[in-house]
Regions:
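A conserved acidic beta->alpha catalytic loop
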Residues: 48, 52, 60-69
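N-proximal low-complexity "stem/linker" segments adjacent to membrane-targeting elements
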Residues: 1-48
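Active-site nucleotide-sugar/metal-binding loop of Leloir-type enzymes
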Residues: 94-105
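Conserved donor nucleotide-binding strand/loop of the catalytic core
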Residues: 73-87
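C-terminal catalytic/acceptor-binding lobe
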Residues: 1-10, 14-17, 185-282
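Short beta-strand-to-loop acidic/aromatic patch adjacent to the donor-nucleotide binding site
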Residues: 103-114
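Conserved catalytic core of nucleotide-sugar-dependent glycosyltransferases
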Residues: 116, 120-221
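Acidic helix N-cap motif at the loop->helix transition within catalytic regions
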Residues: 33-34, 65-74
Length: 282
């Protein structure tokens, strides 16, 4: 039985969706083994993301432990918060992309990234300043030049200035290797034979590459590349491949404004965190 009509029928939304939003998918099921020290990592990621970008933040939490969820609800208080069972990172990101209007500038990040002030504004500058951009990252690693930059280089060859060589500090590659659990010396030996591709267009300079663990885009562009998966952590190289295959540019800021932390904050990483916040974070 129903009496009358819902008073919201035919009414416009009272809430206006933001034109820009930074999002993180979190997953901390426990604080044991691999996850033993990750609570601090996730908290640092979210604090630095908000500290470095004056935009709303959305967190999609995939089945995390109560301690993280209590912190999200009581202390961090993101502008948008979804608490769900673990539906998988890729499926969460697909849902996030579909939640916002197609023109929305939206950032996607894993929960173990560190951000410097200005990461958002510089990424948006490239997204708006270059044509047909699919992904812009704030964290460059030379290894990423192997990941689907054909369309970027093809476009740049005719429309921009391209420089090829070793431009990034070796310390950045050491940070990369340590953050993903690689042995540093073999990694450095490998990347010394690889080149960076620096692109300059209308006074803006960036690198050809993007990281699927952290990037900004437009919701309507990236939404078509996320698909439902029965895997908790789907390998995302296919995302890179499809964006590149459709002719979109994949770019990274010329200054390092983000960093992958890994699952442990050691003394060296703590120095990076202090630098990112402009002081030692408390």
């Amino acid at each position: 039985m129903r009496i009358g009509n819902n008073p919201m029928r035919g009414k416009p939304l009272q809430h206006t969706m933001p034109g820009e939003v930074a999002t993180v998918t979190t997953h901390l099921p426990n604080q044991e083994g691999y996850h033993a020290q990750r609570l601090e990592v996730v908290q640092t990621c979210l604090k630095s993301m908000r500290n470095g970008a004056n935009v709303p933040v959305m967190v999609w939490d995939n089945g995390s432990c109560q301690e993280l969820r209590d912190w999200l609800l009581d202390d961090y208080r993101p502008d948008f918060l979804v608490l769900s069972d673990n539906v998988g990172k890729h499926n969460a990101q697909k849902s996030i992309a579909n939640l916002f209007p197609p023109e929305t500038i939206i950032g996607f990040s894993d929960d173990d990234m560190l951000f410097w002030r200005g990461w958002w504004s510089e990424s948006v500058r490239l997204l708006k300043g270059f044509p047909n951009v699919g992904m812009v990252s704030a964290w460059y690693a030379r290894t990423a030049t192997k990941w689907e930059i054909n369309s970027t280089l093809e476009w740049a060859g005719g429309e921009a200035q391209v420089e090829r060589g070793n431009f990034t500090p070796i310390e950045h590659e050491i940070d990369y290797a340590r953050s993903v659990g690689m042995q540093v010396d073999p990694h450095i030996t490998r990347i010394l034979w690889m080149d960076d591709y620096k692109i300059t267009y209308k006074g803006m300079t960036c690198y050809a590459s993007a990281q699927h663990c952290q990037f900004i885009t437009r919701a309507g562009v990236i939404g078509k590349y996320f698909h439902w998966s029965d895997q908790a952590m789907l390998a995302q190289k296919e995302l890179d491949e499809r964006v590149d295959a459709d002719g979109y540019l994949r770019l990274t800021t010329s200054t390092r404004l983000a960093l992958h932390m890994g699952n442990v904050i050691d003394d060296e990483l703590r120095e990076r965190i202090g630098d990112a916040f402009g002081t030692v974070m408390v």
